[in-house]
Amino acid sequence: QSGTTTETKADTNAAQTEAGSQAAESTADSAKDTQAASEASADLSGSITMAGSTSMEKLANAVAEAFMEKYPNVTVNAEFTGSSAGIESLLSGSVDIGNSSRALEDSEKQNGAVENIVAIDGIAVVVNPDTKVENLTKEQLAQIYTGEITDWADVDGDSAPIVVIGREAGSGTRGAFEELLDVADKCTYASELDSTGAVMAKVASTPGSIGYVSLDVLDDTVKALK
C-alpha cells in the first residue's frame, strides 16, 4: 500500500509538473502573440478612405473608430455620398472601400469590384406623425409610389394629399425599396433627397408625407407603418 501511495504521488507530481510546463508554454505563447500583435499594430500606418451609402453611416463610423483604436497610426476617412457614388469612387480608384446598401451589378463586378456582405438592414416605411394611417399593404404602397393612390382617404385615412418622398436615383435604399415593390422606374416622387437623414427630416416636417428609411436610423420624429 505504501508503494502504491508513493507511485500515485509520483504520478501526480509528474502530471502536475507536465501541466505546469504546458501552462508556462501557453503563457509564453500568449505573451509572444500579444507582443507580435502589438508590434503589428505599431508597424501598420497610413490611411484608408471609404465612401458610399448614407444608411451605412453609423456602421461605417463605428468600424472606422474601432480600427483606428486598434491601429493608432492609421487614419480612416469616411464620406457618405450614396451607394452608387461610392461604388463609382471605388472603381475609379479614388477610395479604398465603397459602401453600398445594394448588391453589385454585373458590370461593376466585371470592372473589378468585389462584394463582401457585412450586415443586413431593414427598410422602414415612415409617415408624418400626424397621419392617422397605421399600416399599408404592399399593393397599397406600390399604388401610392406610382401615383395610382394620391389621397390618404383612399387608404382609410383623413382626406389629404399624399406627399411622396424618396431617395435620389442611384441610392441603394431606393433600389431595394423599388425592387421589393416591383415598381422600379415607375415611381412618382414629390421630393428625391440625397440621404436617409434628409428623407426622415422631410417626412417629419411635411404634413401628409410618406417615405422610406434605413431601419438602423429610425427615430421617433416620424411614424413607422406596420
Question: Predicted segment positions?
Answer:
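Exported/periplasmic ABC-transporter solute-binding proteins
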Residues: 2-226
